Each structure stands twice: as structure tokens, then as C-alpha cells.
Amino acid sequence: MWSFSKKTTIAASGILSGAADHHSHILPGVDDGVETMEESLHILATYEDLGIKELWLTPHIMEDIPNTPQKLATRFEKLKAAYKGNITLHLAAEYMIDNNLCKLLQETPPRFRGEVVEDRRGEKSPAEATMGEGDRTPKQDPPHLLPIGTAGKHILVETSYFNPPMKFRETLRQIKSLGYYPLLAHPERYMYMDNDEYRRLREEGVKFQLNIVSLAGGYGKTVKKKALWLLENGFYSVAGSDLHCEDAIEYITKCKLSKQHIELLKQLLQNKI
């Protein structure tokens, strides 16, 4: 039993037991993450040793990496066939807010007829406000998007770290109009965002995903400070590793946190969306 009076490592705290990782680049050979099946399987074995029970594979989809749901699903099936362990694997994607995503959204039918996505002020997105309760039946169209979460109601998105996209707010509204919640990956890493912007986004119904590496200082002191503020003030819904290679696992497990931050991170690792 370890004492909460001092900082302890994430590994020693035991909070990874039963955890869900909501952001990773472990699907091999599809983006800038893991390249080989062998490396993917080795990482999964290490995850098992740490007690992680659920993993979302979220490869990039952007103009420079134009993956498709069909291509990723094929690769995902190969990984599932090769993996014999106990971690539950899910396929989603991390979408850059760019022209490629705007085009995909224009081609995507609403997730549910009449699905209502509200912001924290209770305001419905315009396209959904006109739909009735009786129309809320699932669409069965071929997938245009790869949502994240067991209910399939969230789209993991990212932006440039330095500048907001030209159609940032418009794209977020369009995601909501299709019956999804935007889940913003690693908001602490965006240099152009401040606390007021985080508050505005939360009020508009955007949810946040923490990169655990940010708490370890892996992206610098400024990012760590922002991550701790967001964590302490309850902005995050879930957490993820954003793992691109095996070396990052040790960086995460050796991260030392206070009792308060360990408890807050534990909750995020147990959360479902």
C-alpha cells in the first residue's frame, strides 16, 4: 500500500487496472504510429501486464493521411485475428479538422433520425431541433465516419497545435447536426487556446480527451500546466495515451502525480462515453 502524502507513479498507483485508453495509434501500418503487427502485439501484451482492459485504436484521418473506414476496418480485422489476449479492442479514428473532414461531413447522413445533441445551455443543433421523437431510429448506411465510444455518439477531432482551423466552429456545429458530440483530442496541447476558450467550447457541447503524457510533462511545462488546470476543473471526459510507439509506455507509467491528480485521472480512465 502506498501513501498519498507524496507523489507516486501511475504504475505504482494501480489506476491502470481495468482502465480504458481512448486514444492510440497502435493499429499497424496506417499512419505515423506503430508500423508492424509484431510491435502492436508486443504493446498489447504490455498493456495486459498493466491491467488495461479496453483500448480504442484511433488512427489519423486527414488530408495528408487519407485513410478510409473500409481500409482501417480491414487492417483492424487482421489485428484482431492475430491478437489472442483479453483486452477489448475498438476501432475509431482521429479526424483533423480540415477540408477532408468537411467533405466527409457533407457526405455523412445523420447518425440517428431525430438524435438530439445539446450544448450545456440546452440549445439543440438546428438540424435536429426540427425532428420528432418518433424519428429516432438508427441509420444503417455504410460508415462514412468512425465514431468513438460504445454508443458511437462521439467523433474524435484535433486541430493544428498553433492555429485554429478556418472553419473550426462551423465544423463542430456540423458534427453536432449529424447527431454526434465532438470529442476534442488533447486540448491542452493547443497553444492558441486559453481558459476562456475551453469554457466556451464546453458550453457549446464539446467534450475533451486528456493525453496522459501531458501530465508527465512530455510536451513541455506550459502544456502540463494547462492539462492540470483542465483536470482539476473537471473539463475532461476521458483519457488516452495517444501512443505512437512502445517507448511512450514507460514515460506514462513513470509519471508521478499527487493524490488529487491520481484520483481524478483514475475516474477518467474508468469513464465510458
What name fits each language-model region?
Residues M1-N86, E128, G134:
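An N-terminally biased module of ancient metal coordination in phosphate/nucleic-acid-related enzymes
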Residues A20-H22, W56-T58, H90-A93, L183-A185, ...:
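Active-site neighborhood of phospho(di)ester-bond hydrolases with catalytic His/Asp-centered motifs
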Residues D31, I61-D64, Y161-F162, E188-Y190, ...:
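Short histidine/acidic/glycine/proline-rich micro-motifs that form metal-
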Residues E48, K176, L231-E232:
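Non-catalytic positions within long, well-ordered alpha-helices that form the structural scaffold/packing
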Residues I52, F235-Y236:
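A structural motif
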Residues T68-R121, M131-G132, R136-K207:
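Extended substrate/RNA-proximal surfaces in nucleic-acid metabolism proteins
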Residues E128, T253-I273:
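Mid-to-C-terminal alpha-helical segments outside catalytic/metal-binding sites
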Residues Y236-Y251:
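Short acidic/histidine-rich active-site segments
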